[in-house]
From Swiss-Prot:
Catalyzes the methyl esterification of L-isoaspartyl residues in peptides and proteins that result from spontaneous decomposition of normal L-aspartyl and L-asparaginyl residues. It plays a role in the repair and/or degradation of damaged proteins. It is an enzyme of class 2 (transferase). This is Protein-L-isoaspartate O-methyltransferase. InterPro entries: PCMT, SAM-dependent_MTases_sf. GO terms for biological process: methylation; protein modification process; protein repair. Its EC number is 2.1.1.77. The active site is at residue 62.
């Protein structure tokens, strides 16, 4: 007989549903990814709480509801190719990996990129490629993407990043000042042109250009 999930994980799952996450594929992906593996050992007792937690290099792992909400807004299909800007702990990429064909995730901190890669490999997320790179300067050879997810706040989404969307592609990003509340924005490369919709208020660490010289 399989063991029942711990009470804190059951509450975690229930809270996502109560807060409006209804896409069953997204809920299954969130259930399948062990968030406690993506936080530091001293914070594992907090892993199933719906709150952001600190990780290395002054970054954070987003609260689960925000991860689920952004994932749901991407409207992912199994054949999609996804670009993630800001790997962080690798938690968001692990969720995405269960919903699409391929994930390319860029991280400017080598420490984070290396540790995320190791976690994702341990979970056999073989369709995720972690690269040390600059999210403001995506390599041309990467091509176009069906979906792009930015996990740090941009003051504005660069046109060069929007240009990486394939036709009918969707980009989700927090947009706004770095030291204030931002707005989660959905941008679609529709047949008639670029469509933009503001979704909800969020708070993210800033997206910075370049690759970190240290860490």
């Amino acid at each position: 007989m399989p063991l029942a999930p711990p009470p804190e994980k059951m509450m975690f799952q229930l809270s996502l549903r109560r807060r409006g996450i209804s896409d069953q594929a997204v809920l299954r992906a969130m259930d399948a990814v062990p968030r406690d593996l993506f936080v530091t050992p001293d914070l594992r007792d907090e892993a199933w709480r719906d709150t952001a937690l600190p990780i290395a290099c002054g970054q954070t792992i987003s609260q689960p509801f925000v991860v689920a909400y952004m994932t749901e807004q991407l409207q992912l299909k199994p054949e999609h190719r996804v670009l993630e800007i800001g790997t962080g702990s690798g938690y968001q990429a692990a969720v995405l990996s269960r919903l699409c064909q391929q994930v390319l995730t860029l991280e400017r901190f080598k420490t984070l990129a290396d540790s995320a890669r190791a976690r994702l490999e341990s979970l056999e997320c073989h369709n995720v490629e972690v690269q040390l790179g600059d999210g403001f300067d995506v390599p041309a050879k990467a091509g176009l993407f069906d979906r792009i997810l930015v996990t740090a706040a941009m003051e504005e989404v660069p046109g060069a990043l929007i240009a990486r969307l394939d036709l009918d592609g969707i980009l989700i990003a927090p947009v706004g000042p770095h030291q204030a509340t931002q707005t989660l924005v959905r941008i679609r490369n529709a047949k008639g042109g670029i469509e933009r919709k503001e979704l909800v208020a969020v708070r993210f660490v800033p997206a910075l250009p370049g690759i970190a010289r240290e860490l």
